[in-house]
UniProtKB/Swiss-Prot annotation:
<feature type="binding site">
    <location>
        <begin position="65"/>
        <end position="72"/>
    </location>
    <ligand>
        <name>GTP</name>
    </ligand>
</feature>
<dbReference type="InterPro" id="IPR000795">
    <property type="entry name" value="T_Tr_GTP-bd_dom"/>
</dbReference>
<comment type="similarity">
    <text>Belongs to the TRAFAC class translation factor GTPase superfamily. Classic translation factor GTPase family. LepA subfamily.</text>
</comment>
<dbReference type="GO" id="GO:0005743">
    <property type="term" value="C:mitochondrial inner membrane"/>
</dbReference>
<dbReference type="GO" id="GO:0097177">
    <property type="term" value="F:mitochondrial ribosome binding"/>
</dbReference>
<keyword id="KW-0496">Mitochondrion</keyword>
<dbReference type="GO" id="GO:0005525">
    <property type="term" value="F:GTP binding"/>
</dbReference>
<dbReference type="Pfam" id="PF00679">
    <property type="entry name" value="EFG_C"/>
</dbReference>
<dbReference type="InterPro" id="IPR005225">
    <property type="entry name" value="Small_GTP-bd"/>
</dbReference>
<dbReference type="InterPro" id="IPR009000">
    <property type="entry name" value="Transl_B-barrel_sf"/>
</dbReference>
<dbReference type="InterPro" id="IPR000640">
    <property type="entry name" value="EFG_V-like"/>
</dbReference>
<dbReference type="GO" id="GO:0005759">
    <property type="term" value="C:mitochondrial matrix"/>
</dbReference>
<dbReference type="InterPro" id="IPR004161">
    <property type="entry name" value="EFTu-like_2"/>
</dbReference>
<dbReference type="InterPro" id="IPR027417">
    <property type="entry name" value="P-loop_NTPase"/>
</dbReference>
<keyword id="KW-0999">Mitochondrion inner membrane</keyword>
<dbReference type="GO" id="GO:0006412">
    <property type="term" value="P:translation"/>
</dbReference>
<dbReference type="GO" id="GO:0003924">
    <property type="term" value="F:GTPase activity"/>
</dbReference>
């Protein structure tokens, strides 16, 4: 496809992409030909420049940072410094998704190639931009595997935060060389010595190695790349060996299909080659190879040490599994797959239903398209008595679910109802069988309850950084959420690092929102899996006139059943209208009522036309009305609109 913008021939200074609006006249055939020739010359010049750079001059690095510490802004400054983009181009070049820009988070791993000349020789740098949130930890670890080091970014005004700590330990465990960067030194609230001291005490990195910068203004950013070249080792790769490539990430392009981001560990890869997956043993024809500069730029070939893209002609995006190894077809004998492959494992499950049931078919297509771009989401159809046809979705975490819902609404304009999140519970039966349940409907009913030997629920180790003055509030919050304290560490500048083991089910129920609330927004949170523990869990059903509302059924700890039941019945009562008969709203556990609310019958004055003295007729009409209401209560059915479920399930209520 011919690009309608000119790529400059000077490689060290890259002009911004020109925006073409409908008012611009179309190019003539001669202009298109000249542009095509110019692009081809530029592409060849880039390829020749890469081929001249020895692998000893490659540097692959990432940026480790807490959310909102300036990772995307620093990336922009580095791209400007190396001439990949010009100053003034759109901010957050590496954040491709709209939701990434709006939330200020990175969801998909991205990369960009940069050239740097220190006056003596050329260097090829690959910046691998990774998600920072624990929900996307699988993508983070695969991205780190393609790097030799990382920039450890710390906000000078906020200091070390939870996500920084968690990602530091992940990077450190993978042997990455870390360069500490103190960012936002231009702020009035910046405490540079305090941030440096935190880096030294928390991570045992020499504070003298810290580089103090302002990514916003560009102050001192020019010191970073020389430090990368000096401290981060070149990739340990060999171009002469048979091809081995690690899949770092992938996405679906509507025009070319699946695009895969690969770290070429050994060998060389070019258009027309056949490659094979180590995991599935499926073969693919490579349609295109290239580098991200910052967008896709086709090359003749890519080689060992590079982090680059290929278009493999893959039909099903779910075949692209992060961490998979690819070989050249017919030349894989005796080769070992690269370490680190693991299937995405959903840990949070929700029921999803269209707000308007008539839109199911259209929304099903939209849902399938979105899942194409996110292989970590599991999708299967399910039916609810209350909400009709829908889907059961599995996500890596609550943020992952929230991002998916937001993308569905923004990219397709869909209105969707999500049920309360459920985590995977393990059930061990007395006959030796084991079952993992992700839906409250799968929970054993009363007839099978005595067959169960034990229930297990997943736990996580939560890492929180909070101001010392709010430590008591946070400890109370953790205790109320069945948390168990594991460690407490006093950082400098009045910050405390808390480690708690907390049930995952408690964490996905807006724990982070409550944490922010009790610390006035100053706390940060990260977590990692801590295995399964025995637990006394039960199924809490919400019934309206004896009819269970499956969309509102949830699994909780027995100690919380009564309090949660009272909360549910009083909350749902607000969204039901009065009927001509009395309506009972009950919360049940093991068929026993633990909480109840009653909606009084709508009263009609059947005696308004009677004479005051007609007592017998008065009593007769009231008795008849009473009998009618009794019969209606026994046989009548309460019609509940989807709006009521949607309002009940909305978290901000």
């Amino acid at each position: 496809m011919l690009l309608r913008y000119r790529i400059p021939e000077i490689l060290r200074i890259r002009s911004p992409l020109k925006k073409w609006y409908s008012t611009v006249k179309p190019m003539s055939a001669a202009e298109e030909m000249r542009l095509k020739i110019s692009q081809e010359q530029t592409r060849k010049a880039i390829q020749e420049r890469i081929d001249k750079i020895p692998i000893e001059n490659y540097r692959n690095f990432s940026i480790v940072a807490h959310v909102d510490h300036g990772k995307s802004t620093l990336s922009d400054r580095l791209l400007e410094l190396t001439g990949v983009i010009q100053p003034g181009m759109k901010a957050q070049v590496l954040d491709k998704l709209e939701v990434e820009r709006e939330r200020g988070i990175t969801v998909k791993a991205q990369t960009v190639s940069m050239f740097y000349n220190d006056g003596n020789q050329d260097y090829l740098l690959h910046l691998v931009d990774t998600p920072g949130h624990v929900d996307f930890r699988a993508e983070v670890s695969r991205s780190y595997a393609s790097c030799g080091g990382a920039l450890l970014l710390v906000d000078a005004s906020q200091g070390v935060q939870a996500q920084t700590v968690a990602n530091f330990y992940l990077a450190y465990s993978m042997g990455l060389k870390l360069i500490p960067i103190i960012n936002k030194i231009d702020l009035d609230s910046a405490n540079i010595p305090g941030a440096m001291e935190q880096v030294e005490t928390t991570f045992e990195l020499d504070s003298n190695d810290c580089i103090a910068v302002s990514a916003k203004t560009g102050l001192n950013v020019e010191q970073i790349i020389p430090s990368i070249i000096k401290n981060i080792p070149a990739p340990n790769c060999d171009e002469t060996k048979p091809l081995r490539a690690l899949l770092v990430d992938s996405w679906h392009d509507p025009y070319v299909g699946v695009v895969m981001l690969l770290h070429i560990v050994d060998g060389k890869l070019k258009k027309g080659m056949k490659i094979v997956s180590a995991h599935s043993n499926k073969a693919y024809d490579v349609k295109e190879v290239g580098i991200m500069y910052p967008d896709r730029t086709p090359m003749d070939h890519i080689k060992a040490g590079q982090v680059a893209y290929i278009i493999p002609g893959m039909k099903n995006p779910r075949e692209a599994l992060v961490g998979d190894t690819f070989y050249q077809l017919g030349k894989s004998e005796g080769l070992e797959p690269l370490p680190g492959f693991e299937e995405p494992k959903p840990m949070v499950f929700v029921g999803a239903f269209p707000a308007d049931g008539r839109e199911f078919n259209a929304m099903d297509d939209q849902m399938q398209n979105l899942v194409l771009n996110d292989r970590a989401v599991t999708l299967e159809q399910e039916t609810s008595n209350a909400l009709g046809l829908g889907w059961r979705l599995g996500f890596l975490g609550s943020l992952h679910a929230s991002v998916f819902k937001e993308r569905l609404e923004k990219e397709y304009g869909a209105q969707i109802i999500l049920t309360a999140p459920t985590v995977p519970y393990k059930i061990f039966y007395k006959n030796g069988t084991e079952k993992v349940i992700t839906n409250p409907d799968e929970f054993p009913d009363n007839t099978r309850h005595h067959d169960v030997e034990k229930y297990l629920e997943p736990y996580v180790e939560a890492i929180m950084t909070v101001p010392e003055e709010y430590m008591g509030n946070v400890m109370t919050l953790c205790l109320n959420n069945r948390g168990e304290q594991k460690d407490i560490e006093y950082l400098t500048t009045g910050q405390v690092l808390l480690k708690y083991e907390i049930p995952l089910s408690q964490l996905v129920e807006d724990f982070f929102g409550k944490l922010k609330g009790c610390t006035k927004g100053y706390a940060s949170l990260d977590y990692e899996e801590a295995g399964y523990k025995k637990s006394d869990i039960v199924k809490l059903e919400l019934c309206v006139n004896g009819e269970p509302q499956d969309a509102l059924t949830t699994i909780i700890h027995k100690s919380q059943a009564q309090a949660r039941g009272k909360e549910y019945v009083s909350k749902f009562k607000k969204y039901l209208k009065n009927q001509l008969f009395e309506v009972a709203i009950q919360a049940k556990v093991n068929n026993k009522v633990v909480a109840r609310e009653t909606i009084k019958a709508r009263r009609k004055d059947v005696t308004q036309r009677l004479h005051a003295a007609d007592i017998s007729r008065y009593k007769k009409l009231l008795e008849r009305q009473k009998e009618g209401k009794k019969q209606m209560k026994a046989t009548g059915k309460v019609h509940i609109k989807n709006d009521a479920y949607q309002a009940f399930l909305r978290r901000d209520d």
